[in-house]
Amino acid sequence: MDYQLVPMDKSHLKEVAELDKALFTRPWSADSWESELYNDTVSLVVAEDPDGGVLGYGVLGVILDEGCLEKIAVRPDCRRKGVAQAILGSFLRYGEEHLAYIGLEVREDNSPALALYEKNGFTAVGRRKNYYAEVHKDAILMDKVFREVTP
């Protein structure tokens, strides 16, 4: 599959918002996506095909030396082709260089995402009961530590 990772810009917003709405039970609004473009504490990455189409995207929030993986999403027809791994890999490379850790929440029944995160060194550190109340599912909290945080 031919694609490249690029920083998200305004040209991606419509496709990203549509994909987000199709894939998530709590999608972000178009306005939220646009405001994230101008948020200095967020890294937005798009996997873009040669024609500029969005195959997937990722969002990493950063405060000081802490990262929060907010979203990784890939079009259903582009899954199992390394797109999510490439997006996550870009965030992990940034994390190794600049962060103490990256944390995330993932729905307990999202087996592909759980496998991806575990394969990349994330470990389960907790659970939020009924976090996804609309589908009665828990969130699994996971972290990948790059260096110990000292108070």
Where are these regions (language model features)?
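Conserved catalytic-core motifs of GNAT/GCN5-like acyltransferases
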Residues: 103-105, 123-138
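Short hydrophobic/aromatic beta-strand or adjacent loop that forms the aromatic wall/cage
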Residues: 42, 137-141
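Conserved GNAT acetyl-CoA-binding A-motif
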Residues: 95-105
